[in-house]
């Protein structure tokens, strides 16, 4: 979720957060629920299970996320973040604009979880990839010659993780979408 959350906090409120400068490749693991705000840089929030990675989403400047003990936040480029344990947020929630941004994040996380569950339960591999690309196109809003196009700043392996498929299944489905002229 992109937000202007750092702009709504005064210096006293911002001082309640841990400010961290993290190098590319660093990882954040949380023993309890932690709220992380990116001031600069980028990262990805992932689950790992049986040696497989499932990327929940990519994060960048002005994104807020929640990290818990079942996921990891990997830093993809040098980043400046602010983090705080969820248990220490009581005073911050008195700031109405901060509380709204935080609530919006919780709502978006809930909606994302439902979309993931729905796609895992009900959609074919082609449907998962097509729906992911449609959602990404809507978010990026890139147009050329009257057509939407999508910038994929990641590999097919990462795409397969986003849609909950093995790389080979994602590759096959992606090629079928091209063959069926659904994507070009």
Regions inferred by a protein language model and the residue ranges of each:
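A residue-level structural signature of the nucleotidyltransferase/glycosyltransferase Rossmann-like core
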Residues: 35, 80-82, 151
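Cyclic nucleotide-binding regulatory domains
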Residues: 21-78
């Amino acid at each position: 979720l992109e937000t202007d959350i750092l702009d709504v906090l005064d210096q006293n409120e911002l001082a309640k957060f841990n400010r961290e400068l993290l190098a590319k490749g660093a990882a954040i693991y949380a023993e309890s629920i932690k709220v992380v705000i990116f001031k600069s840089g980028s990262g990805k929030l992932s689950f790992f299970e049986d040696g497989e990675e499932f990327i929940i989403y990519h994060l960048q400047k002005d994104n807020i996320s929640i990290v818990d003990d079942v996921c990891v936040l990997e830093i993809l480029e040098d980043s400046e973040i602010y983090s705080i344990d969820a248990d220490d947020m009581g005073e911050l929630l008195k700031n109405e604009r901060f509380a709204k941004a935080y609530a919006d994040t919780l709502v978006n996380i809930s909606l994302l979880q439902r979309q993931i569950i729905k796609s895992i339960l009900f959609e074919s591999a082609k449907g998962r990839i097509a729906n992911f690309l449609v959602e990404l196109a809507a978010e990026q809003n890139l147009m050329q010659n009257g057509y939407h196009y999508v910038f994929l700043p990641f590999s097919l392996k990462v795409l397969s993780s986003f849609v909950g498929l093995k790389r080979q299944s994602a590759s096959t489905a992606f090629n079928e979408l091209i063959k069926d002229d659904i994507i070009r």
